[in-house]
Amino acid sequence: MPSLKEIRNRITSVKKTQKTTSAMKMVSAAKLNRAEDTIRRARPYSVKLRAVVSSLSGKLTPDDNPLFRDQAGKRVAVILMTSDRGLCGGFNANLCKMLARTLHEEGIDSAEMHIVGRKGRDFFRRTNHQIVADYPDARPEHYLDIVFTVLDGLTKRFAAEELDKVYLVFNEYKSILTQEPTIQPLLPIRPLEDAKEEGEQEILFEPYIEELIGPLVQQYIQNQMYTAWLGTLAGEHAARMTAMDSATKNAGEMIKQLNLYYNRSRQAAITKELIEIISGAESL
């Protein structure tokens, strides 16, 4: 049975942990608000660009641009987006496990991995998949450079038929409580039915559609990766905020139980001392 001092030390330790988790929750909430604001500001451009590319894809054949060409084969490259830090529940583990399971089901034993974030890198180091490039500690101010670096190499290799498919894997941010693991085909570019609905009217291209293909396609692919990163960032903060909120509540419950146990132990110790005093007095 632990002593009263040990119980007091345990209560003090749990209270310190509770303060830490509460502070982390507030920090994550503030970061989530900023991330959501960035997503809201980026969405109009993303929606319009998707509508333009969807309209464009309906007017092109694979011969017009190699990035629209569907290629049979299992030479697959994956761009995986995870976080650098933990303490965010199953945010990273669920995504990595889903990707590993999907690759196994598709019979892809050695995909080419381009990984943003430490957690994804640490997970796939234990597999047979080849980590071609990883970007730990990816700060927001450096992220566009990473986007351009990754996509420039992959689009050139896809156009040269060195790759058959490129997938973008990330946690799509739905709400504070929901971050959905997503595997999104990035290359080849396919018609986007949802973008057609969002775009509403048909888009006219002037003067020549051929002059717009290259720049628009590059902007679209870059925007897809950037949008996925924004969702991953918001999802990470939401998952960490939820996890820290749960940890703070659990710490509060533990403190209540420890206080109750402490009071009972203290009462039992006092009762025992009184009995000993009374017994000693009676013996005299």
Name every feature range the model reports, one short phrase each.
Residues 1-284:
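C-terminal beta-strand-loop-alpha-helix "lid" module of Rossmann-like NAD(P)-dependent dehydrogenases
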